[in-house]
Amino acid sequence: MPQKPLKVTKKAKDPRRVTKKQKNLRKAAPLQLKSKKKSLQHLKKLKKSSSLTETTERLVASKVGHLELLRGTRKELEKGKKNSK
């Protein structure tokens, strides 16, 4: 008669238990890499949202004509007029 491997059922782990990550939260946190050069440390503080805001405003202004925002710079408007002629 052939023998099968035993079926081992694991006990369900208690959901209230504390894991290693919960004990030491500093290890689980993402790494904050700091540049060693003093001249580059200010770059970490910069937010890159200004160009995104500008492009969004420009897009909205070009789609809606009655806004007080410009549709672009003067040079861009002149190029558009030349291309349309």
Swiss-Prot record:
KW ATP-binding (keyword) present: no
Name under which the protein is recorded:
Uncharacterized protein YLR363W-A
The record's subcellular locations are: Nucleus
Record organism: Saccharomyces cerevisiae (strain ATCC 204508 / S288c) (Baker's yeast)
Region entry Disordered: which residue ranges? 1-28, 35-54
* Compositional bias annotation for Basic residues: 35-48
Where this protein primarily resides, as one coarse class?
Answer: nucleus
Q: Which Pfam families match?
A: DUF2462
Reply yes or no: does the keyword Nucleus apply.
yes
Q: Which GO terms describe its cellular component?
A: nucleus
Domain of life of the organism encoding this protein: Eukaryota
| Sorted UniProt keywords | Nucleus
Give the free-text miscellaneous remark of the entry.
Answer: Present with 6650 molecules/cell in log phase SD medium.
